[in-house]
Amino acid sequence: MNGKPYLEFREDGTFQVLHITDLQEGVHSKKDTLRLLNALLDTAKPDLVILTGDQLKGYSPAFRLLGKESVQNTLHILTEPMEKRCIPYAVTFGNHDVQCGISNEEQAAIYRSYPYCICPAEEQAAGTFYLKIRNSSGAEALRFYLIDSGNQTVHGQYAPPAPAVLDWLKEKLFQDQIPSMVFQHIPLPEYKKCRNVTLKERICSPEKNVGEFELLRDNGKIMAVFCGHDHKNDFVGQVDGIDLGYTPSGGFACYGPGAERGGRLLTFHVDRSMHYETKVLRYCDIVAPHTGNRIKEFFDTHTPTCWPGRTELIDEENLENA
């Protein structure tokens, strides 16, 4: 990969991914965000970090006032923990990144300039590509698709992935059938079909269903989709044999689940191709019981993010209303 790190299973047959999402940092990064990021890396010791969008608090006016250099500075701060530890990482984008005034394509070029960023030059939208994980013989044994799930809203609603992204995905999915996992920012509409999972906030998926889930299901080798976007959600459900999961937000410059912010560790085994294990590593468990800002933590924990502002359980009785 043009001198970039080579991704392969460890000698013990495992491969570990740390999924981080919604850091949403501005021009002055929050200390708690960096504490969590460093603790996640030291605790998980992953083979790969996947960032699934909203790395930037793009709606902050400071980015547009200060220009591209401010974006570069923030991205440098957020990627330095991986760079210092020589941990490969890959990046896709959310709905807020482009709001900083710098296009996702320009941001992707900034990321690619760092030695341990393994994002290839995209064939379609920035943030849309796949990564091969090889076994000891050099053969591809596992694949991760990173998808640009869209960053624009239409009449106040989230737009689905662009047609060109779906065409690319369809082409790649059916070239080979490799055990795979998908990472993107915005959840699929099918997340609303998950049963017996705890909702900590409303599922904010596109109103228009463009058939992405059907493509993944028809491939037959997709284990799961993991996303962010809805900062407090952290469930893993299942629809038609595909796990649909959330990772809670990892940033402290936006709303979130208080000291339960964190990242998701995923462990794969070379001899169990369609099997994985996962757990959420939380700030309160790996950094400290409370954050450095107890007032914000209180409001994060007690302010409702969906009406009627309570934890909901999706099951067969209320599925149609979810």
Please provide the spans of the model-predicted regions.
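Active-site environment of divalent metal-dependent phosphoester hydrolases
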Residues: 26-28, 57-60, 91-103, 152-155, ...
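Divalent metal-coordination and catalytic microenvironments
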Residues: 22, 37, 49, 54, ...
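N-terminal active-site segment of His-dependent metallophosphoesterases
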Residues: 1-77
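Binuclear metal-dependent phosphoesterase catalytic core
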Residues: 3-6, 11, 130-138, 212-219, ...
